[in-house]
A protein has these predicted regions:
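N-terminal active-site beta-alpha-beta segment that forms phosphate/nucleotide-binding
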Residues: 1-77
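Conserved phosphate- and dinucleotide-binding cores of soluble alpha/beta proteins
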Residues: 52-195
């Protein structure tokens, strides 16, 4: 049942329909669901933080789509050193979760900095949490431990973003305020996957 829900995940459609008209949106890397959503819109400006070279790939994809579209999305690659300036120039920050728990999301590097800066400045931060990404606490913690198992913390492939830095959650149910979001696990804990 969960597999079918993942394949038919309405999260990108909810996001595309809910993004403010003409908004400047900051994304990190190439988020699959948020990337799909911004491609559905022709009135946005996307500031893509070039996390692991993925922001530039997203911008190239947006530009190719714009060549076939009259409106097209305006997209710009931002070096990670410019993350604060990009966030402060945005109307909205999208942080896409590769996994989520009741208290946090796991996202690409730079996401925590972007969310913290935005929250501190009163800029909305929407966590994009697709179907199948809400995990039991033990599974989430195990995943965090695995991606963080590097020689130095700044080499980790992902980082934890506390939900307290998020204003809204975009999910299967639509765009909801953080405190109203259902972040309960979507699947039982598989003990054999831990460790």
């Amino acid at each position: 049942e969960l597999t079918g829900r993942i394949e038919l995940d309405p999260t990108p459609d909810h996001l595309a329909a809910s993004l403010p008209e003409g908004a400047t949106v900051c994304v990190l890397g190439w988020p699959d669901l948020a990337g799909e959503a911004v491609l559905q819109r022709g009135d946005l400006r996307v500031l893509a933080i070039d996390t692991a070279g993925q922001g530039s790939a997203l911008v190239r994809r947006i530009q190719r789509a714009a060549e076939h579209d009259d409106a097209g999305v305006d997209a710009e690659v931002i070096d990670p050193a410019g993350i604060a300036a990009a966030v402060l120039s945005s109307d909205l920050v999208l942080v896409e979760a590769s996994a989520a728990s009741l208290e946090a999301v796991l996202a690409v590097p730079g996401s925590r900095a972007a969310a913290t800066i935005a929250a501190d400045e009163g800029i909305p931060v929407w966590a994009v949490v697709g179907v199948g990404r809400r995990l039991p606490a033990a599974a989430f913690d195990s995943l965090v431990e695995r991606v963080g198992d590097v020689r130095v913390a700044w080499d980790a492939e992902a980082e934890v973003v506390p939900l307290r830095s998020v204003s809204h959650v975009v999910c299967e149910a639509g765009v909801v305020e953080r405190d109203d979001a259902d972040m309960r696990p979507e699947c039982p804990l598989a003990h054999e996957l831990l460790g």
